[in-house]
């Protein structure tokens, strides 16, 4: 689930200050608008932050244009986005809080082992939000919901990096 799996972090939103049902629905509905754009999402992250691409051994040092249309890239992007979709589907329901927390905590631990820094988590957040703004129905309410979810999620994931 390499670095792109941090997208899953974007949807937890139920840790320190739970997302409201409306916020969770905004995150879910906006994600539904892009969840089938796996390759484009991963390519956007890599284009914005080549240091993130460098953390993926199978893609490190390669020209993004030369790998974007490969089966390996599509397979990896799909695996990651599917993980995010699972986490997003769990968000907004208090009964799922422990499952989401466990997934995000494990994600942080796994990424610590890969040498991912808090700064790279921040880069990913920036790239993700930029992608979402350009590809979904985006307004102040959607931005607030994603920021709330990201703030909560990063609190858990970054703690795992310590």
Curated annotation (Swiss-Prot):
User: Which Pfam families does UniProt cross-reference here?
Assistant: Globin
Q: Which Gene3D superfamilies match?
A: Globins
Q: Does this UniProt record's set of keywords contain Heme?
A: yes
Which keywords annotate this record?
Heme, Iron, Metal-binding, Oxygen transport, Signal, Transport
Q: What is this protein called?
A: Globin CTT-VIIB-7
**Subunit structure of this chain's protein:** Homodimer.
In this chain the Globin domain maps to: 18-162
Q: GO MF annotations for this entry?
A: heme binding; metal ion binding; oxygen binding; oxygen carrier activity
Origin superkingdom? Eukaryota
**Which InterPro entries would you find in this protein's record?**
Erythrocruorin (IPR002336), Globin (IPR000971), Globin-like_sf (IPR009050), Globin/Proto (IPR012292), Mb-like_M (IPR044399)
Family, per the entry?
Answer: Belongs to the globin family.
Output the PANTHER family linked to this UniProt entry: GLOBIN-LIKE PROTEIN (PTHR47217:SF1)
Extra facts: There are at least 12 different components in Midge globin.
Write the gene name: CTT-7B7
GO cellular component, as recorded: extracellular region; hemoglobin complex
Question: Keyword Iron, does the record have it?
Answer: yes
Question: Which parts of the sequence bind heme b?
Answer: 76, 111
Stretch forming the signal peptide: 1-16
